[in-house]
Amino acid sequence: MSAQPIYKRVLLKASGEALMGSQGFGIDVAVADRIASDIAQARAMGVEVGVVVGGGNIFRGVAVASKGGDRVTGDHMGMLATVINALALATSLRKLDIDTVVLSAIAMPEICESFSQRATLYHLSLGRVVIFAGGTGNPFFTTDSAAALRAAEMGAEAIFKGTQVDGIYSADPKKDPSATRFDRLTHSEVLEKGLAVMDVAAVALARENAIPIVVFSIHEKDGFTEILTGGGRATIVTDS
């Protein structure tokens, strides 16, 4: 790819639902391999990549709470689901000979390294893809919030939020054909309009740290790398 990237260090947020593909549950290895291929292309362009994966394809803590269960326990189960997804994506990356490390917010030394900013920056300096697992390590915080937090800690120039659609819309375009697509928004506009991009805490944290959010379709092959070079189709959230 001849075009030069406009970002040198980014955080990719991929939902657990994206990893399950057309399946109703679990991990579609072909999808994990495709996402890994996009990340590998970004690395070939010299872009440093951190990744946060959700766990909704396996478990959601809020589902427990909605049925009368303990939200804290449910969130802990959801955090463990993100570790499974992180290991799956790491496996797909290693099949492509991409040096990858999984850092977990929950200590589990026999499975992966524990998260710290120092470890993150060290692994990035060695050219490794860093996958962050375990969310923030705290209940009541989403993996979107974890993405914004890790992006700030690693000094990311942008958060790339891979979604089911090609940007931010005024409503769910799959349910409302009249939904309007936005090409560009500010963080404040996202919050004021109540747009379902990331949760309020995540958008606010990104705004406070002047980190743009790039929303694109995770299902578009090469979409991630095209946007890295200024092409592709996405909505950019920035105050600059």
Swiss-Prot record:
Pathway: Pyrimidine metabolism; CTP biosynthesis via de novo pathway; UDP from UMP (UMPK route): step 1/1. Its EC number is 2.7.4.22. ATP binds at K13, A14, S15, G16, G56, R60, T163, Q164, Y169, D172. The lineage of its organism: Bacteria, Pseudomonadati, Pseudomonadota, Alphaproteobacteria, Hyphomicrobiales. It catalyses: UMP + ATP = UDP + ADP. This is Uridylate kinase. It is an enzyme of class 2 (transferase). InterPro entries: AceGlu_kinase-like_sf, Asp/Glu/Uridylate_kinase, Uridylate_kinase, Uridylate_kinase_bac.
